[in-house]
Amino acid sequence: MIKGIGIDIIEIDRIGQAISKNNGFMDRIFTLNEQRLFEEKNNIMETIAGHFAAKEATAKALGTGIRNMKWKDIEILKDSLGKPYVELHNNAKTLADSMHIEQILISISHNKSNAVAQAIAI
């Protein structure tokens, strides 16, 4: 049973600007595991923007948006085949558990200017 759906789109340039203007942006938004994934990519800005959109989409699927949780409470990782998956921590996990959410499915895509992600909580 679907318990929540979220979608987010972001301009890749906005992420680049946020990183340039705010020294703490990456550490505030992304876990060390996520940052390690970015280091492995050639198209790093597209990947970072996609992960940011995935966090937003996941928060929307939980029905709250980012309020009442921290960005790092939602972690977007990749399996051995490169498929993204969501790991929830702290307040995000507590909320998902209270909603009896067993899994959040995530899909991420981008073109040269935008990144988009959709999350489905089941």
Curated annotation (Swiss-Prot):
- Statement: the UniProt record of this protein carries the keyword Lipid biosynthesis: yes
SUPFAM superfamilies per UniProt: 4'-phosphopantetheinyl transferase
Q: What is its EC number?
A: 2.7.8.7
Q: Which reaction does it catalyse?
A: apo-[ACP] + CoA = holo-[ACP] + adenosine 3',5'-bisphosphate + H(+)
Q: Does the keyword Cytoplasm apply?
A: yes
> Which cofactors are named for this entry?
Mg(2+)
Cell compartment(s), UniProt: Cytoplasm
Question: Some GO term, biological process aspect, for this entry: which one?
Answer: fatty acid biosynthetic process
One Gene Ontology CC term in the entry: cytoplasm
GO molecular function: any one?
magnesium ion binding
Top class in the EC scheme: transferase
Q: Name the family.
A: Belongs to the P-Pant transferase superfamily. AcpS family.
Which HAMAP family does the record match to this protein? AcpS
Q: What is this protein called?
A: Holo-[acyl-carrier-protein] synthase
What is the primary gene name for this protein? acpS
